[in-house]
Regions:
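Active-site-proximal, glycine-rich beta->alpha crossover segments in alpha/beta enzymes
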Residues: 79-83, 91, 107-114
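N-terminal amphipathic, basic-rich helices that act as targeting or association modules
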Residues: 3-86
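AMP-dependent adenylate-forming
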Residues: 33-38, 74, 100-117
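Short, solvent-exposed loop/edge-beta patches enriched in aromatic
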Residues: 53, 94, 104-106
Length: 117
């Protein structure tokens, strides 16, 4: 990687107009309130997410309001490393479409568009 590439890639592509209204900021506040933490920056949130992986993903599940017909018993299969591909959210049963299109129940707008030649 050249110095020019390093410099170009370190510049943000986008900065939100209202950083306190971003989902990342709201998620950080959610985690702080739920866990009694005092994460202030994105870097602190990231560091916590990679050191307490199970709590991070459990909080992602809760924050996003993931709907499931059967809840998970374990977030992450214990005793396995990422290179051995552990099982995630064991016991959970969910409908992907329900979660992706959730909140559109009362919307009269199309959820998907399709174009063909």
């Amino acid at each position: 990687m050249t110095q020019e590439t390093k410099t170009a890639s370190s510049k943000p592509l986008w900065i939100p107009e209202a950083p306190l209204d971003t989902n990342t900021h709201k998620f950080k506040d959610f985690v702080n309130a739920k866990r009694g933490l005092h994460l202030e920056t994105y870097e602190e949130l990231y560091a916590w997410s990679v050191t307490d992986i199970e709590s991070f993903w459990a909080d992602c599940w809760a924050y996003t309001g993931t709907k499931a017909s059967a809840n998970y018993t374990h977030v992450l299969e214990s005793g396995k490393t990422m290179d051995n591909v552990p099982k995630w959210f064991s016991g959970a049963a969910l409908n992907y479409t329900e979660n992706v299109l959730g909140g559109m129940e009362n919307n009269q707008q199309p959820a998907l568009y399709s174009l063909g030649e």
